[in-house]
Every structure is written in C-alpha cells, then in structure tokens.
Amino acid sequence: RDEVTRNGLTIVNGPEDHPQAVIQGWYPEMTWQMMAEVSYAVEAGATYFVTNRDLTIPREMGIAPGCGSMIRAVITATGVEPVASAGKPEAYMYDEARELNASEGHDLVPKESSIAIGDRLDTDIEAGNRGGYDSLAVLTGVTNPTELMLAPEHLRPTFIARDLRELGEIQSEPVRCEDGTWECRKASAWFENGRVQVSDPTSMDGLRAAVCAAWEAADKGAQMDESMVPNFVLGEQ
C-alpha cells in the first residue's frame, strides 16, 4: 500500500468506492472476502493488474497455492484476464534490478553479463527468455528433471544446476556428436526407438545430456511425454 501511495495513486477501501484499477498481489492471509471484493471491482470495470502469477510456492511443509492460484479464482469468477503483471514471466523485474544497481553508483550491467536464476520454468526462466537474458534453472524448488526434459522452447534455460553452489563452478557444455549422441563429460544421451536413453541417470552431466537429446527430439516433431524420458535419481553432490 505504501509503494502504491508513493507513486501518486489513491487507495480506496473497497469496490463500493468505484476504483479505476485493482492490484492483486501475494498475501498469505488472503481471505475469500478479499478475493470477492477484487472480483466485484473487476466486474464493475476496474482495470485488473497483478504482481505475479506463480501458481505454487514452496513452503516448509510442502508446495502451497501461490499468487497465481488466487488470481485464477478471480479470473474464473469474472472472466477477465489481468492486463499486465509486474512480476515474472515478464522481464521487468530483471531490468529493474540492473537499473537499481546502476542507480547506486555502479555501471549498468549489460544483459550479456547477467543471468536469471530460479526454480520455476514458467516464471523465472520464461522471464529470462522474454527479456533476452541467459538463465539458470536450479533443482531446489518446483522444477524436476522430467519437467526440464519436456520443456517447450520458451521455457528452456541456458544452464541447469542442482543448487546455487554450482554458480561457482564451470558448467560442462553438452556436445552433439556426429551420430546424434549428446555427450557431457563422461555422460551421454541419445534418442532411440521413441525414447531418450542416458548412460548415467544419477548425475547432473547425464541430465544435461538427456535434456539436449529430449529437446532435439521435440524440435524434430516427436510428441514427448513422461514415458519417453528417463527417470533421474540424482546422487548426492
């Protein structure tokens, strides 16, 4: 509320005040009544903005509904899609981070020297792709190896890491061999008989190779699904 006020907007108490716009964001104490009031205002013609559309959020006890799940409830009730989102998968947040860093007396970091990092393909990684950033998907949250192998082009990261500790390591780059096999150091993967095969389903290098093999098969027209990719059980680092 303070941020909205500082930007010259006036906050009203509810839909009975006929707001011109509604901003819905993540609020863990969100109630049915609050979502209903958003719906009433949107139905009455208020422009609908949201802060982010993450459907789920990792919590200590497991995966919980995120802001996007609450937004879907309003969309279902009103039939109205938000006109814009300040959060991912839009790239504004990454652009703003670079500009904020520059406003503190530092040089503006060019996009080619920046990297978008996250555990969600449909927000963190898609935002990086939309904004022209390299991206790193980490496996410490929502995304799992199967989802990586089945990712459509707009959700594919530049790099894959087990966790943030690998930021300090040089990533091994998968290489495509003449026979169509993808090799990543000692691991290899290939597409054969309608399925991705991998030499080592316990290593990150095996996953990197398998991801490349799966993406190549999909790009060539294979209708990829879970039955066509290996099950990874990554060993301890």
Regions found by a protein language model. Name each.
Residues 1-237:
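Asp-based, Mg2+/Mn2+-dependent phosphohydrolase catalytic module
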